[in-house]
Amino acid sequence: MANVKINNISARQILDSRGYPTIEVQITLSNNVFAKASIPSGASVGKFEAVELRDHDTNYYHGYGVTKAVNLINSEIGQKIIKLETLDQEKIDNALIEIDGTNNKSRVGANSILAISLAVAKAAASTLNIPLYQYLGGITAKILPTPLINIINGGMHADNNLDFHEFMIIPHGANSFEDAIRMSSEVFHTLKKILKQKQYNTNVGDEGGFAPNIKDNTEVFDIIIDAIEKSGYKVYKDFSLGLDVAASTFYKNEKYKFSDYQFSTHELVEYYKNIVTQYPIISLEDPIAEEDTLGWKMITKELGDKIQIVGDDLFVTNCKLIKNGIDNNMANAVLIKPNQIGTLTETLNAIRLAQKNNYKVILSHRSGETNDTTISHIAVAVNCGQIKTGSLSRSERLAKYNELLYIEKLLNTSAIYQGML
């Protein structure tokens, strides 16, 4: 279908799940097909992420407004993108990068660029009358990802005393994605009952997981395992656990301080070795601070052949940083967040680089989300087999899970559930 071009670009300011402004873009094509995309924002931001453009006017949304970005899209950027061929995603993304002209997208903002990039892809898929996952991945796109479900929130994602950001359940023993969500929902609601019985609060954090004040991390593991078993499931067989440590948030002066303890890098790695032995933990995300290169090499050497060691802040969806990690044996898995890099093309390139070098890939949301479900489609398109998109409460999280349930139905008998990581 040749010569379907971008006819109009319209941006507006909306609110994300934390009540902060973000961008929504609508692309209208020359055949009158249109599509919208909206952009998330993170609470824990890696030092090397592409830069969001914010207004920084403290009298307007406390400085978090995005009217500058919206105005740029509706004027300068839009004028240069209109009339480009919709089906040439790479050309459009390269044009957006060129318009910005910086190495970190700080002039027009990664949020501006990504909103356009994703909306273009959605419009192209609609033009061809196929789902986005099929447009991006073709007929080989058929693996439904195992969800890493953030069942208890801590760190910067919750107003409680837990140091680690996310305590996750991983339903690798399910027979289908639908089965995985059902099993996880049962554990989620059982966990709520257990927390109430122990007189912990059951308020939820930014990503929909419970946010109780539990002093000891090991008690959190014990409570989650209790919820799994009381739901009729077995650890290791049906569920295992994952952690997003976000170690950079408590790393200072070459020391790690949490739970009233101060650790050297070596001591922290020993701590991880101990809990991985004691508990069914099969995935550690950002267990080491992004600048602690020796620590990353150490933990990968000690645990990399046993569990998944995930780099988020270490890699920030950036091919250059991923290659550096591969060359230096740091981590064995890459977390992918499109807004860390700013275009769909760069996101897909980062995924391909990781997969080519046998690094596992996990598609991920951000703490400040919208109801946009693009990451669900990307996860299936690239057959990465894993997705992180929060807990089983808050509609912006469930939107992604519900979209994957829909994709599984579309794929019908072709659908394959990833299962074990």
UniProtKB/Swiss-Prot annotation:
Any one GO biological process: glycolytic process
GO molecular function: magnesium ion binding; phosphopyruvate hydratase activity
Keywords: Cytoplasm, Glycolysis, Lyase, Magnesium, Metal-binding, Secreted
Protein's UniProt name: Enolase
Ribonucleoprotein among keywords: no
Main location: cytoplasm
The family this protein is said to belong to: Belongs to the enolase family.
Keyword Cytoplasm carried by entry: yes
Protein's organism: Ehrlichia ruminantium (strain Gardel)
